[in-house]
Regions:
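Short, hydrophobic beta-strand segments
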Residues: 256-262, 355-374
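Extended substrate-binding grooves/exosites of carbohydrate-active enzymes
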Residues: 1-249, 255-278
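Beta-strand-rich structural segments
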Residues: 224-228, 270-271, 307-325, 331, ...
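Edge beta-strands of extracellular beta-sandwich domains
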Residues: 276-288, 389-399
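Short, solvent-exposed loop/linker segments at the N-terminal edge
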Residues: 215-220, 301-310
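Short aromatic-acidic-glycine turn motif
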Residues: 246-247, 290-295, 334-350, 401-406
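Short flexible loop/turn segments that cap and initiate beta-strands
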Residues: 229, 235-242, 281-283, 309, ...
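Extracellular Ig-like/FN3 beta-sandwich strand-entry sites
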Residues: 262-266, 307-309, 376-378
Length: 408
């Protein structure tokens, strides 16, 4: 099939996208030795195939460099490296071992495993800890990957596998009921996992600090990690300082680590600038029992002339409004003035119907996706659960013009 159709595919792809400014390189393929069941990366067969495809791309667009993703631990990539303009390596550390005069980058990296809001391996429920300490055998933790590429003088950077969890490849469980991946920086609902904040601390210049885990436990010593881009951080438990740490003391995993004897109450992380001014703060409270549901929306108004969807987040809260981080209450959604498209909770081993109106919360949260009915007025979404106060939210509907804005 490939031999018969590659020219057609290359032509249609480039003609479709060559005016798209987001396209910076053309890739000849990913892990082509595996996907085409060819020989070793140094074989004449695979070199000839890639040379032919590269020539086809260059004939259509010589203005952009070509690249490809290669997975060849210990393999001979010199012949393939000579074909493309920019060399992509899947996994394999920081690429220091590959000899080439071409630009080099991580075309697929990491494959770290985590479940949002879980802080110990839970084999019964097929959930991985949200501490950045688990990866597949061929991959690395997120922090290991970031550190490798930051320390490399040769690499242009790396692409992470993956931004989002996705349905399929529930590595390493690989059996029912696990049905989606655990690789994501965010889960299938789009809810950030803790590792999201590690990346934020590395790449965002806006002051930030993030505590993990939550602060609702039974007892024991708790490993507390802080992700922050501030010059120094300080952790407090119930008003008592547990010590200040400077940026130079940041661990190799891109976080500040404390071991804290658990006591119910409040844990606070402060971030300071170089002059000692407080510029960022995160707080975790000990939660009580679930008491109510609270809804929030990704938008306050929806254009009825569009096919826009509205994403409704449901949080399970205690009577004081604190998120109950281990809550798993079954939540039922209803909507007036619209239609439920689906529900989810982001857990890779949850097999409730995604197109249904009911979902159990996972780590205190679940999601409902709704679509307007085309009429003006308001769309009202309600969430109910046994024994809890219902949550409601309204989204305005109408033919509105949404002004385009530049990213912040």
């Amino acid at each position: 099939y490939f031999t018969d159709h590659y020219a057609e595919v290359v032509t249609s792809t480039i003609h479709r996208d060559w005016n798209n400014p987001a396209v910076i390189m053309w890739s000849l393929g990913n892990e082509v030795r595996t996907n085409l069941t060819l020989g070793d990366y140094s074989s004449s067969e695979i070199v000839n195939v890639c040379t032919t495809v590269n020539s086809a791309v260059k004939a259509l667009d010589a203005t952009r460099p070509t690249t490809m993703g290669n997975n060849a631990p210990g393999g001979n990539l010199s012949a393939l490296m000579a074909i493309v303009d920019v060399v992509g390596i899947n996994y394999n550390g920081n690429n220091q071992t590959y000899q080439t005069d071409r630009p080099i980058y991580g075309s697929e990296t990491t494959s770290a495993l985590s479940s949002r809001g879980v802080y110990a391996l839970d084999s019964e429920n097929m959930a991985y800890p949200s501490y950045d300490n688990k990866a597949v055998s061929w991959g690395n933790t997120a922090a290991e990957t970031v550190n490798a590429y930051l320390s490399s003088e040769r690499s242009c950077g790396h692409f992470v596998w993956t931004g989002f969890d996705y349905i399929g490849e529930p590595t390493e469980w690989n059996k029912y009921p696990a049905k989606s991946s655990y690789f994501g920086i965010v889960d299938t609902c789009g809810f950030p996992k803790d590792i999201y904040f590690m990346y934020q601390s590395m790449w965002d210049s806006r002051p930030m600090i993030h505590i993990l885990p939550h602060w609702t436990h039974e007892s024991g010593n708790i490993d507390v990690w802080l992700y922050s881009n501030c010059a120094s951080v300080e952790l407090f438990l119930n008003g008592t300082s547990l010590g200040k740490k400077a940026l130079s003391q940041r661990g190799t995993k891109n976080q500040y680590a404390y071991t804290v004897a658990y006591a119910a109450g409040t844990i606070v992380a402060n971030g300071y600038d170089a002059s000692g001014n407080l510029i960022a703060q995160d707080i975790q409270y000990t939660a009580g029992t679930p008491a109510k549901l609270a809804l929030s929306s990704d938008k306050t108004a929806v254009n009825t002339a569009s096919d826009d969807l509205v994403y409704i987040t449901c949080d399970v809260l205690d009577k004081n409004g604190t998120l109950c981080p281990t809550a798993s209450n079954s939540v039922t959604f209803t909507v007036v003035g619209g239609t439920i498209i689906g529900t989810d909770n982001g857990h890779g081993a949850n097999v409730e119907k995604l197109s249904g109106s009911r979902h159990a919360a996972f780590s205190g949260k679940c999601l409902c996706v709704v679509k307007h009915d085309g009429a003006s007025g308001a769309m009202k979404i309600t969430a109910t659960a046994n024994g809890l106060t219902a949550g409601t939210i309204s989204v305005t509907k109408g033919e509105t013009t949404i002004a385009a804005t530049a990213p912040a």
